[in-house]
Amino acid sequence: MLTKIQLKPGINRDATNYANSGGWFDSNFIRFRNGLPEKIGGWTRIYANQTALIGQCRKMYDWSNLAGNQYLAIPTNVKFYVDDSSSIIDISPLRRNLTLASNPIATSNTSSTITITDVNHGGTVGDYITISGATNVNGITAAQINKEFVIQSVINTSAYTVTTTGTATSTGSGGGSVVNVSYQFHKGTTSASAFSGWGSGPWGGSIGQYGWGYGPGTTFTTFYNGLWSVDNYGEDMVACPRDLTNGTLIGGVNPVSTSNTSNVVTVTQVNHGLANNIAVVIYGVESPIGGIPITQLNGTKIISVANANAYTYTTANVATSTASGGSSAISIQPSIIYWDITDPNGPAVSLGELGAAYEKKYLPYVAVEIMVSDQNRQIIAFGCNPYDVTKPQDKMVIRWCDSSDPTNWDIADTTKTAGEQRLSSGSYIVTAVQNREEILVWTDTSLFTMTPVGPPYGYGFNVVGSNFDIAGPNSKVVAGSIAYWMGTNNFYMYDGKITAMPCTVRDYVFLDFSVDDGEKVYCSSDSGNNEIIWFYPSQSQGPAGSREVDKYVVYNYIEEVWYYGNLSRTAWIDRRGHSNPRAVSDDGYLYNHESGYDDGSTSPASAINAYIESSAIEIENGDHFSFVDRVIPDITFRNSTTHPIDAQPSVTFTIKPQDYPGSQIGAGNARPVTRNSSATLNVNRFTNQLFTRLRARSVALRLESNETGVSWRLGIPRLDTRKDGRR
């Protein structure tokens, strides 16, 4: 008797073998379309000659300029890259740029290592710097010195080493009087405990003399885990490193001074490396100086550089005496960066470095995340320092700039639209996302809606749900007008109300999910296949807190089914005007997905081992043993490629017999199912039938392919069975 094998779509790992009878149990690199399983598309490198990205990318964002040219932001924990659709360019922002004292480069005979002397350099091992203007030094040529380097070791606060490609012929110093060094923002870690980043100190993590994320006068380091938020401001780009503060202890005894009857405040900061007319944030002046209150001494200040060791700013009040103070004061460059698309080869700069046309008032110097409001064209900073310049970062505060100036955050100016709100439910903001008519904001315990309401309030806030969590800042996505996210033990959706999503692979995912690495979860969509995809780290690798993304789970929101597989993608972006979704792997390369049917990370491309396996399928309700002696497969190899005419794209069709749920699975029979194809005639000829002989109460089916160029879809196969008794 011929029996149709029509299985329920989706993978179910949470039911028992018999409870899921007639369903699918396991898979890799497959999806469901119209209820039937098929192999997914492959992936190819976007640029065949790409050099691997430096660092680990955990964010992708695309936009276009006014001419329609498309750009893709690709920040890592070490660099900030942009793909301009023809090449990948490095726009990493600088934290410091200055000309050093004369002859700052020291060599040691026969060594390729050089020592750079720079007082208060703030460098850390792994940071990138660029040297220019140096002359030959003791056998190491200028061409070997004037380039980009990685700091290899830090000798002290005034010296560090880098390694050149040259070899010194003697010991000594040199380099000339115009040696310039540009310091890129500090390298972040690739791992950190979930939400244990910058913010663990008494006021958001102490900021210290070594720059972003170090404690003044201490040896501890707070984490910057390399996460970025990115958005476009018109055709330009804005971005912010998560919880990262570019702060420097001003240093010295009483470095902030006033002069009687003057409103000019002088800051003495040795080798500050700051430029004229930029805005810096002064923080930590704890008492008035010369009669000027701390609310005027602290805050965003546009500075005038007096010399390499001093700069000035003005206050509203004049001093009533000549005085000095501020021994604990810190100068901070705001961490929100801006990239002007009309200068594509220039680095991204801090908001405080924008030109005189910008007001630069009350800039936030640190934030958990930023975005640009679609409705109001305002930069919104989540979990930032408040408007009150005497207070530290508050991870429940939301601020937004004036709609006409990304640098004006002055909420006291009633002619502007800047504003501030502190949320009430939760301890810290985790992330936010733009929906059609509202912004969704997750704290550690709740979900808020943030809706434009117009002046004088700007936005209205409502709690729409509590008592759940979110795995990490990138574990959410909006598809249509529905938000989906991954928590630490469930999947959720919000379509006006919060719902825990029914999930047939919940135990499979969450019993293996490395919760301590939740900040690495990356959620995106593939609109062409109606899929929400979560890439997540499993517990099967390394210690907790250092595990990398190695698995994925998919929810098909049209078919309402789940499936999963093994693949490392640290960031992913939907098609959005492109033919393919794009992704970054932990190997540092960019890939087009749904491109061909093979693994393009190798050269030549290699096969994708795609398979799907069913749970037990009872024969004749399982009350008798039955013989299975024939299989009529129903498989199409449509769009298979790369095979020469005389080859046969094939899959392996395996039948696994079993007597009882707990009994041993029989050896089974594996038979190749092939299609003969003619490239000239486009003739498809399927294998008609397969003959086998096995006896069981139930069978499981497995379909697998491991050849290049193979595409397949399974239909409704049939088994020819014959009843054979009860034992």
Predicted segments, located by residue:
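Short beta-strand segments and strand-loop junctions that repeat across beta-rich extracellular domains
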Residues: 79-83, 193-198, 334-341, 386-413, ...
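Elongated alpha-helical scaffolds
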Residues: 75, 222-250
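Recurrent small/Gly-Pro-centered beta-turn motifs in extracellular repeat architectures
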Residues: 76-77, 241, 383, 443-445, ...
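Beta-propeller and closely related beta-pinwheel folds
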Residues: 43-63, 223, 340-521
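Structural signal for beta-propeller blades
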Residues: 80, 246-247, 336, 447, ...
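Short, conserved, GDST-rich strand-edge loop motifs in beta-rich repeat architectures
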Residues: 244-251, 385-396, 428, 539-545
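Beta-sheet repeat architectures centered on beta-propellers
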Residues: 1-97, 185, 193, 198, ...
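Small/polar beta-strand repeat architecture
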Residues: 1, 14, 91-227, 250-363
